């Protein structure tokens, strides 16, 4: 029996430890993936800390997976072949029978499968995933570049393209981290007049490099909403920062019929009153990632526009250090665990 290495968490809040798992064959409608890279998302902390229901320990987290099909199970219909380059993100498969799935809205499936929650994630050299979770990686993206596109990329890209903003509209991106730096790049490439909002004057140069037309320093003294109104008001604010206070502070900067798209997860409540929403007809919407097809669209658009995530790679053995950098906010801008052939063979 062959084996492969994983970085697992033995109990809630425990550090990662390197251990081995026995390779198993994929079941019907599943594929086994040889993982080349896996991004580290802030949402991984919810799994590691046991903050979500039914999280099982020992845990192998990771839902920004890029690799190659190593083996196919029955019923994959010949669509996937050994060697195909694939990505798997937060959308790790759906049930196909709940009300949302029957309406074709698979990403809000009532029994959504998330890697690291429903089955072992990408902090290991192999993953067995449902075939409907697979997105084909296009030529032009490396594994380390493709992995973050399966969650951070698709969430920002989809959040913008499903918003009411149209080319030429003022669109603000709150936060310049793992999601935000991609959000700014996508917004600029989509033809929006792009505003980046972050903390500190030192981020202005980065915002310009990413393609932003304007930069708002949220610590400069002028309220963020006032700064947005001085630019004419935002048609859309894409809130990538996991900070409810910062998200709430943008609402009064929306133009009439504007939309706040929330993708940054924070346990604290938003402080928005009905009065703020009623008169200007504002919309507050949560946006949940995207399907495998959406991931493919994101990657195709990224190749077309020359957009790549800014990543820092580390080997699986340094999972604790890489995860720590993500938590501390010192990553520039997405930590990615890169796997080796040596980690797969036991």
State where each predicted segment sits:
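Short N-terminal strand-loop motif that marks the start
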Residues: 1-66, 129, 338-346
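C-terminal hydrophobic helical "lid"/dimerization subdomain
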Residues: 1-4, 248, 292-346
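Glycine-rich beta-strand-centered segment in the early N-terminal region that forms part
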Residues: 24-38, 51-99, 133, 138-144
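NAD(P)H dinucleotide-binding glycine-rich loop of Rossmann-like/cofactor-binding domains
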Residues: 94-174
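Adenosine-nucleotide cofactor-binding segment
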Residues: 170-176, 188-249
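Helix-to-beta-strand junctions that scaffold the AdoMet/dcAdoMet cofactor pocket
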Residues: 254-255
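Glycine-centered, small-residue-biased loops immediately flanking beta-strands
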Residues: 258-259
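Rossmann-fold NAD(P)-binding glycine/threonine-rich loop
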Residues: 264-280, 292-298
